[in-house]
Each structure stands twice: as C-alpha cells, then as structure tokens.
C-alpha cells in the first residue's frame, strides 16, 4: 500500500494505492456493484450501480446520513471518476444527504491489471479548499480511502469484513 500526499497553493489532494490478488474485472465489479460495495465498505448500504451520469447514494454505518455521489465517468475495468460534497464538518443526523460544504471534490479510481491475475487500484481525491476544515476533511477521506482498499483486499481475497468496528 502506498500513500502520497500533495499540496499546492490552490487545493489539497492525495493518492493511495494497493494491490489486490484478484483479476481486474472482479475487483472493478466489487466497486461498481452496490451489493458488493455494501458488504465491505458502505456498511450502511449503497444504492445504485456506478454508471456514467448516475447519482448514487452511499451510507456508512459509522457516520450518520447518506452521501449522494455523482458518477462522472466509468470506463469498464479501468477507471471511475466520482464527485461528492467536500463535507467540511457537515454532519447529518437524518436520512437526508450530508450537505453544507457548498463545493465538491473529485475522486478518481484507476484499475490496472498486473501479472498473476492481480490488480493495482489507485484512488486519488482532490479539490478541498485550503482551510483548516478542508485540510481535516482531506485527511479524513485519505484515511477512509486507505481503509476502503484494505477492506476491499480482505473481502475479495479472504471473504472477511474489516470495516465493522473500525471507526466506532
């Protein structure tokens, strides 16, 4: 697993990556399929398959409220681009989407087939404002995406769910 942080004068961004010992199509499907995603990552439930132009909802049991996710681009077995609200200290205590940051970040996931039916998954997120809240939110999301990669690996390679109890 690699973690790379970059800071520019305009925004905050990061990139995390990890290798999964499964074929690229299987790994890709575990991300775009809401039933699979709900088993290891969006433990409060995911609604909607990731397809270009769709808006889906992700809910995390540890964080109240559902998060709307705009699917900007899906290239089968290669790339997923998402946009969602930056969530700078925004919290929801209802079933309504989290709102409050008034700007969005962009998440780019890339899937690369490796030898031996392995897959390199790289996740980058960018677009936070250079504020203390933006910095905290970017660090929190970096932790979240790193956790997602670990959970994805454990789920696909060993059939176990790591997320339960990790954050709360």
Where are these regions (language model features)?
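Hydrophobic ligand-binding cavity/cleft-lining segments
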Residues: 1-47
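Short beta-edge strand/loop motif at the mouth of beta-sheet-based domains
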Residues: 15-16, 35-70, 75-79, 164-167
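A short, structured loop/turn motif at beta-sheet edges
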Residues: 24-25, 72-79, 110-120
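Hydrophobic pocket/interface hotspot
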Residues: 27-28, 37, 56, 71, ...
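Tryptophan-centric aromatic hotspots in well-structured domains and transmembrane helices
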Residues: 28-31, 40, 58, 84-86, ...
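Short beta-strand segments that buttress and anchor functional surface loops
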Residues: 55-61, 82-86, 95-98
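Beta-strand/loop substructures that line and gate deep hydrophobic ligand-binding cavities in soluble
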Residues: 91-147
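Short, highly charged C-terminal tails/helix-capping segments
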Residues: 154-168
């Amino acid at each position: 697993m690699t973690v790379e942080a970059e800071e520019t004068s305009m925004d905050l961004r990061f990139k995390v990556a990890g290798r999964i010992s499964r074929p690229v199509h299987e790994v890709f499907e575990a991300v775009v399929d809401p039933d699979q995603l709900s088993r290891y990552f969006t433990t409060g439930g995911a609604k909607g398959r990731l397809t270009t132009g769709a808006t889906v909802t992700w809910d995390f049991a540890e964080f109240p409220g559902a998060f709307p996710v705009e699917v900007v681009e899906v290239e089968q077995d290669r790339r997923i681009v998402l946009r969602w609200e930056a969530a700078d200290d925004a919290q929801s205590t209802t079933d309504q989407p989290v709102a409050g940051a008034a700007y969005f970040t962009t998440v780019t996931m890339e899937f690369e087939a490796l030898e031996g039916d392995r897959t390199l998954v790289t996740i980058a997120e960018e677009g936070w404002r250079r504020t203390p809240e933006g910095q905290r939110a970017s660090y929190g999301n970096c932790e979240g995406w790193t956790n997602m990669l670990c959970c994805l690996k454990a789920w696909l390679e060993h059939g176990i769910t790591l997320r339960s109890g990790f954050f709360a």
